[in-house]
Amino acid sequence: KKLDSVEQRQLFSAVGQAKLINRYYELFREHGIPVGQVLTTKESFGTRRHYLNQRNCMMVMLENGVIPIVNENDTISVTELMFTDNDELSGMIASMMDMQALIILSNIDGIYNGSPSTPGTQVIREVEQGKDLSDYIQTEKSGFGRGGMLTKTTIARKVADEGITVIIANGKKDHILVDCLLYTSPSPR
């Protein structure tokens, strides 16, 4: 049977989600860290009851030493109500869980004061509250996601306005999460 685009997305999501969570399970297991899967939709943030239920689920997991692996439930998400991308989802989760920090990984080192490919361009180390970054944000997206740096900075600003530290870092660098947690990373805040 020939599938339409929605059916294709649902099929690929259902198959891919199983592979993805198994991969996370194996990676974390190597370090003795238990993980659990939380599939969500944008609608889960729409009512207080669903919001609190989701928050409580993740709190119980964390209190019991289980790391929640949160992902959009693409198999049932309605296109019009989907998250922009995982950056939006991570920002909403960081706010929901009242986190101290949100680390957004990218394929570049952060926000640059020009095009990252231009010689002499540098990463902006720290963004001041309310600073206009529109001249610096590249609108291209990588071939892997729906968002891009524009979405990352939009989400980062919203989350930072709530008092949560936001770091945009290059996820391709070895030990970047440890570096970010130790604040030794060259990534901007």
Question: Can you annotate each of these PLM segments?
Answer:
Residues 183-189:
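Conserved small/polar residues in nucleotide/adenosyl-binding loops
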